[in-house]
A protein has these predicted regions:
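Basic, polyanion-binding surface patches
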Residues: 1-213
């Protein structure tokens, strides 16, 4: 099949595009507003985009009324956020925090989650998450939108501190079998990544052009 996203002429019940770019890692983002109130929400448009210094991005769409979401606003206004990596055991709690609570309402409390203090930033961490990235806000890039009332934004941050549960480190490396991160698939589907493999790049022999004869 072939279709053009602007025309939405795929002929399927649901747009298949997000079911192709998978699995997408999920940033479980904790922030704090200017009044000291904590927010927690998952974002599946997320990735590490640079290594030195390490930079991450998450993308946020506006609410139905056009207002920017709390995680986005808090990161911009306070300059800080924490990315918690959710494991398979935490998916129900993570889904609870995806609900649309009013500003200032505690998603931590609703999901029954304990907090841990961060070291270099103010937003707390999810206590039982296997890894956390403390981040400082870098900038926001507004992205195109086909709906003038709908805002798409990419928020960039620099990772300033990393926490890893020692239990997921095996032989000096993070074990994907122990990390078991939650990933987003298409539609309403999710995956828990727990199986990986190593593959060496095989060097190709140099090409011989002509003859030395």
């Amino acid at each position: 099949m072939y279709y053009e996203p602007d025309k939405a002429d795929h002929g399927l019940p649901h747009d298949p595009l997000k079911a192709l770019v998978v699995p997408r890692p999920i940033a479980w983002i904790s922030t704090i507003d200017q009044r000291g109130r904590v927010n927690l929400a998952p974002y599946s448009f997320f990735n590490l985009v640079a290594g030195d210094p390490p930079c991450v991005m998450f993308a946020s769409s506006s609410r139905v009324d056009g207002a920017r979401k709390d995680s986005h606003l808090n990161a911009e206004r306070t300059g800080e956020f924490v990315i918690n990596i959710a494991s398979g055991e935490q998916i129900d709690a993570m889904m609870t925090t995806s609900l649309d609570f009013p500003p200032g309402h505690s998603e931590f409390r609703e999901a029954g989650l304990a907090t841990l203090p961060s070291v270099l930033v103010r937003p707390p961490r999810v206590a039982r998450a296997p890894a956390h990235l403390e981040c400082r806000y870098l900038k926001t890039v507004d992205l195109p939108s086909n709906d003038p009332k709908h805002i798409n934004s990419m928020i960039l941050g620099t990772v300033v501190a990393v926490h890893i549960d020692d239990a997921i480190i095996v032989d000096g490396r993070v074990s994907i079998e122990r990390l078991r991160p939650v990933g987003r698939l298409g539609y309403r589907d999710y995956a828990v990544v727990h199986d990986g493999f190593a593959k060496e790049v095989v060097a190709r022999p140099p090409l011989r052009i002509g003859s030395l004869g």
